[in-house]
Amino acid sequence: MTTQNNPYVYAEAIQYQLANIVTPVPVYANFNRNYAKQPQFLTWQLRNVHQDVYTGGIQSNKGIDTPIFQISIFAQNKADAFNLSNDILQSLHGYSGQFGGPDGFFIAKADVHWLYNSYDNELGLNQIFLDCMIYVPA
């Protein structure tokens, strides 16, 4: 029976991939208001680790894993926020290949969806939110 990857494997790969796209901008796995003192930074959250479940006689054909993670971009300058989002869109959307560096795994495709952009008056930060679904052959 085919198994899906451990969520920790996905977390390590996401951190590696995003950090390499936006270097030297810091990338964090979760948001903490203390980071808001930086002029720009990225956070991500793994929202879904999903593998189709089949019923019937053949249970070993599980299809592909389709984990989804949200990318949150924060920047004091609007142009920086939009440029960071563009860097991610250009690098990830439609990407196929090794994901997460040499210790990562192969993905058949990455789909990046722009959810929305906003501005937080309290923090003085422009915000852009993206969803990324990766297709991992099982």
Role assignments for model-derived ranges:
Residues 1-61, 79, 83, 95, ...:
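Small/polar-rich, solvent-exposed N-terminal microdomains that initiate assembly or binding
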Residues 92-138:
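Acidic-leaning, charged glycine-interspersed low-complexity segments
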Residues 74-91:
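Mid-chain, well-packed structural core segment of small domains
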Residues 44, 60-67, 107-108:
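A short glycine/small-residue-enriched secondary-structure motif
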Residues 59-62, 121-123:
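Short, solvent-exposed beta-strand/turn "edge" segments of beta-rich domains on protein surfaces
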Residues 63-76, 125-136:
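Oligomerization/assembly interface segments of phage tail-like spikes and tubes
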